[in-house]
Swiss-Prot record:
This is Palmitoyltransferase AKR1. Residues 1-321, 365-384, 440-513, 592-764 are cytoplasmic. Belongs to the DHHC palmitoyltransferase family. AKR/ZDHHC17 subfamily. ANK repeats lie at residues 72-102, 108-137, 142-171, 175-204, 213-242, 246-275. Keywords: Acyltransferase, ANK repeat, Endosome, Golgi apparatus, Lipoprotein, Membrane, Palmitate, Phosphoprotein, Repeat, Transferase, Transmembrane, Transmembrane helix. It is an enzyme of class 2 (transferase). One of its GO terms (molecular function) is protein-cysteine S-palmitoyltransferase activity. The modification Phosphoserine is found at S51, S57. The keyword Cell membrane does not apply. The chain crosses the membrane at residues 322-341, 347-364, 385-405, 419-439, 514-534, 571-591. Its main location: membrane. It comes from Saccharomyces cerevisiae (strain ATCC 204508 / S288c) (Baker's yeast).
Length: 764
């Protein structure tokens, strides 16, 4: 059942091209609403929720052809309101050609304010209201107000203006829909948030207000598969138990739609999947008839239930214990692998390890992952667990063990300083790894005071930036420049660089410098370990008088020290080989990070630029990915420094369709080799497959103040009174750091320092 609004273009899919809306052109519409219950014999025949006024759907507004025959002057006026032709509107009103309170057509009384509202023409709306236009005038087949018409398209700025000038949010149209219902139906999360904070939070509308069919806004959002709106409604306390006149709860309608994220939110909030409708069907029966079984099962398992809706047994009482087991598993697996390769035929070992890997994967998924704490809608997988950080820790631990018990005793007399250096590096790497795992990357606190959130929304509306790029819908704060929301930390991270699976944490403002120290020491430690192992293998060769067993057994290694290691201590040799393999991606990571620091950009900003160059999209078509409905001609005073950041983080128009990533591409990305290749291309100016010159893209980075300035900004804290060594080694103080040589607060960074201004009073 899809109501009259179902065929209206969603605010999230409107193109940036000028659009003049004439809903009279809707030839046919499937309407949302359940008709009489006797019309529905089974859910399999249920296509949509139908509205009560089926015969009026798609005919809400006047037909222009008929209107033109009746009154060409009125047609000209309404067309000007549609197109935002303020000059013509003013001319006609000031010239007394029309009266602002008598500007409706003769059939459905559609006013100029209605037309301006549904076409997002704020300047025309402002003028008409200033001339005394009735903001609560009813018109159209459903007798809707201009507020209703603006809300159905998700036009936040029009809704805000009308409410501030007397529009009544409690009024309903002939379908029984009020402002909250229509806002939810627009699927524009920004309008939903605006209404929740400025109308519902103030008690003007109940979060669970129903339409004539008994459906709440949560039920509508669940039916539409709008997970963003469902999440926000649940935060405001929307009831998951209220059923409509047919006995359908939000979970029932969510199952009809089959959107997994919606089902996850509802089930996590306590929705009853065993509850039955008036026809005696629960969610499992509905899923079978609507072919959404897979989505329901995914939501159930994600929320800790089996396919039949019963709790999955948890083998660990605490989530931390399960994560600890996942973290330790790679250490044991690597030890077994090295031991087997040391004593058994490699071909046989590969088969054994393959079977062991499958068994380990099955065991972790069945017995360990179910004990993880669930938060949000992201599936819990091994790649989203501490597994990869356990791989690194296991490698580090095995390197430490073989160095301490085997390598150091034989090489200390000849390589004292090298062994001491190895000890210092190992201690430092262990310490930094532990710190990076638990360290705050620069998380901004979420906002819980509704009054503060309302003020933030108001401020963003004033500057035309109330969208998901500037407002965090998860934490309800204004996003500072260069920040990003992290699902792992459930917070916005200042100067977000990237999520690193090897430390199971984000890298941001507060731990980025420590991360650079960490990977640099790691690479140094690997080559120090290599030098000691070569000395160790040489000692082994000297200890064995009979070296004939080396002949013909080392292949390409010849008679080198590495051959001695392979023959006399294969376990140490394999660990060294494994460590050297890690050094490849670590070296590429260091190279990429050094390049980005010199360019003055974060890893995330670099990724956005690279995705822009690889994007595939239809020519001339751009999608509103940020739910921005800023009216055309809206010209607030925006500082160039703030605006320039948009060129870095904003998606390129037409970039919503991208090349699919292969399995090899995923591995390539996890090790960071994809960025290494992109940096090489940028350095020598190679064009990508789409013909873009990567260098021409990165040259537009607004935070690039020259490589010397960028390096100083990264490595030096803003505390000019501290000694130089302290400024280099210590992380930023609180949320403050240098940018173009001046101190900025990254928690409140909404404007970038101007590149053209020479910083005379340098804080270096």
């Amino acid at each position: 059942m899809v109501n009259e609004l179902e065929n209206v273009p969603r605010a999230s899919t409107l193109t940036n091209e000028e659009q003049t809306v004439d809903p009279s052109n809707n030839d046919s519409q499937e309407d949302i609403s359940l008709g009489d219950s006797n019309e529905i014999t089974s859910l399999a025949s249920l296509k949509a929720i139908r509205s009560g006024n089926e015969e009026e759907s798609g005919n809400e507004q006047v037909n222009h052809n008929d209107e033109a025959e009746e009154d060409p002057l009125l047609t000209r006026y309404h067309t000007a309101c549609q197109r935002g032709d303020l000059a013509t509107v003013k001319e006609m009103i000031h010239g007394k050609l029309l009266e602002v309170n008598n500007d409706g057509d003769s059939t459905e009384h559609i006013t100029g304010l209605h037309w301006a509202s549904i076409n997002n023409r704020l300047s025309v709306v402002d003028f008409l209201v200033s001339q005394g236009a009735d903001v609560n005038a009813r018109a159209g087949a459903l007798h809707a107000t201009p507020l209703h018409w603006a809300a159905r398209y998700g036009y936040v700025y029009i809704v805000d203006f009308l409410l501030k000038h007397g529009a009544d949010p409690t009024m309903t149209d002939d379908q029984g829909f009020n402002l909250l219902h229509l806002s939810v139906n627009s699927s524009n999360i920004m309008l939903v948030l605006y209404v929740l904070f400025n109308v519902v939070s103030k008690g003007l509308l109940d979060i669970d207000c129903r339409d004539p069919k008994g459906r709440t806004s949560l039920l509508w959002a669940a039916y539409q598969g709008d997970s963003l709106t469902v999440a926000e409604l649940l935060k405001f306390g929307a009831s998951i138990k209220i059923a409509d006149t047919e006995g359908f709860t939000p979970l029932h309608w969510g199952t009809v739609k089959g959107q997994p994220h919606v089902l996850k939110y509802l089930i996590q909030d306590g929705a009853d999947f065993f509850q039955k409708t008036d026809t005696g069907k629960d969610c499992f029966a509905i899923a079978q008839e609507m072919n959404t079984v897979y989505s329901l099962r995914e939501a159930l398992t994600h929320s800790g239930f089996d396919y039949h809706g019963y709790p999955i047994k948890k083998w660990f009482k605490k989530s931390q214990h399960a994560k600890l087991v996942t973290f330790i598993t790679p250490f044991l697996f690597l030890g077994i692998a090295f031991a087997l390769f040391s004593h058994i035929n490699p071909l046989f070992v590969i088969i054994v390890l393959f079977l062991l890997a499958i068994a380990t994967n099955k065991g972790l998924n069945k017995f360990v992952l179910p004990s993880y704490g669930r938060m949000g809608v992201h599936n819990v997988t091994l790649l989203r667990s501490p597994l990869l950080s356990g791989v690194f820790f296991g490698t580090l631990l095995w390197v430490t063990i073989v160095w301490f018990f085997k390598v150091m005793p034989r090489t200390f007399s000849d390589e004292q300083y090298t062994n001491i250096l190895m000890l210092v590096i190992l201690v430092s790497v262990f310490y930094l790894f532990g710190q990076l795992v638990i360290m705050d990357p620069g998380c901004l606190p979420e906002e819980t005071d509704h009054e503060n959130v309302r003020q933030t929304i108001s401020n963003l509306l004033e500057i035309g930036k109330f969208d998901t790029k500037n407002f965090c819908i998860e934490t309800w704060i204004r996003k500072p420049l260069r920040s990003k929301f992290s699902p792992l930390n459930n917070a916005v991270v200042a100067r977000f660089d990237h999520y690193c699976p090897w430390i199971f944490n984000d890298v941001g403002l507060k731990n980025h410098k420590a991360f650079i120290f960490f990977i640099t020491l790691m690479e140094s430690g690997i080559f120090t370990f290599l030098a000691l192992c070569l000395e160790y293998f040489d000692e082994l060769e000297d200890a064995h008088e009979d070296t004939s067993q080396k002949n013909g057994k080392c292949f390409i290694l010849g008679a080198s020290d590495l051959c001695s290691g392979l023959i006399y201590d294969r376990f140490v040799f394999l660990i060294l080989l494994w460590a050297l393999l890690q050094s490849i991606w670590v070296a590429s990571l260091i190279f990429v990070q050094a390049f980005q620091i010199c360019k003055g950009m974060t890893n995330t900003e670099f990724n956005v630029l690279m995705k822009e160059s690889k994007s595939i999209g239809p020519d001339g078509l751009s999608f509103n990915e940020n739910f921005n409905t800023t009216p055309e001609g809206f010209a607030p005073s925006i500082d160039p420094g703030e605006e320039s950041n948009d060129t870095v983080l904003a998606p390129v128009p037409g970039s919503t369709i991208r090349k699919p990533r292969t399995c090899f591409g995923v591995c390539y990305a996890v090790t960071g080799m994809d960025q290494w290749l992109a940096v090489i291309k940028e350095t020598i100016g190679i064009k990508d497959s789409t013909g873009h010159n990567v260098y021409s893209i990165t040259s537009r980075i607004p935070t690039n103040y020259g490589w010397k300035r960028n390096v100083k900004d990264f490595w030096l804290t803003s505390d000019i009174n501290a000694p130089l060594w302290r400024r280099i080694l210590y992380p930023p103080s609180g949320s403050k750091a240098l940018l173009n040589g001046i101190e900025v607060d990254y928690f409140k960074l909404y404007k970038l320092p101007n590149k053209d201004v020479e910083q005379g009073n340098d804080m270096v």
